[in-house]
Amino acid sequence: MPFQSTVGDYQTVATLETFGFLPPMTQDEIYDQIAYIIAQGWSPLVEHVHPSNSMATYWSYWKLPFFGEKDLNVVVSELEACHRAYPDHHVRIVGYDAYTQSQGACFVVFEGR
């Protein structure tokens, strides 16, 4: 008699960053998260990578970190510019906390194809 497992066949799925397990965020929710990064005094940084390399390599910077940037629109426009330049790449924002020298927040804004 074959063994009947009561455990489901759960497949491991690669998730992307902080909000990877949640439903996709709306544009307003993304703006709120970026505003939070800025309000904390963290330096926004835009990174991108092709989906095939997202788990195996470091992500490439889009320009330099935006040290001291306080304008949400500047950060959003750079995210969109990176997405236009690399439409097939994942694009994420990192909020770098210089005090703790670590990432305060990091999440994917645009998923690549």
Swiss-Prot record:
It is found in: Carboxysome. The keyword Transmembrane helix does not apply. One of its GO terms (biological process) is photorespiration. The keyword Glycoprotein does not apply. Its main location: other. Induction: Cells grown on urea as a nitrogen source have more enzyme activity than those grown on nitrate (at protein level). RuBisCO activity of urea- but not nitrate-grown cells decreases with rising temperature (from 25 to 28 degrees Celsius, present versus predicted future ocean temperatures); there is only one RuBisCO in this cyanobacterium. It holds the Pfam family RuBisCO_small. GO terms for cellular component: carboxysome. Coiled coil: none annotated. Keywords: Bacterial microcompartment, Calvin cycle, Carbon dioxide fixation, Carboxysome, Photorespiration, Photosynthesis. GO terms for molecular function: ribulose-bisphosphate carboxylase activity. It comes from the Bacteria. Heterohexadecamer of 8 large and 8 small subunits. Belongs to the RuBisCO small chain family. RuBisCO catalyzes two reactions: the carboxylation of D-ribulose 1,5-bisphosphate, the primary event in carbon dioxide fixation, as well as the oxidative fragmentation of the pentose substrate in the photorespiration process. Both reactions occur simultaneously and in competition at the same active site. Although the small subunit is not catalytic it is essential for maximal activity. The basic functional RuBisCO is composed of a large chain homodimer in a 'head-to-tail' conformation. In form I RuBisCO this homodimer is arranged in a barrel-like tetramer with the small subunits forming a tetrameric 'cap' on each end of the 'barrel'. PANTHER family: RIBULOSE BISPHOSPHATE CARBOXYLASE SMALL CHAIN 1, CHLOROPLASTIC. This is Ribulose bisphosphate carboxylase small subunit. The lineage of its organism: Bacteria, Bacillati, Cyanobacteriota, Cyanophyceae, Synechococcales.
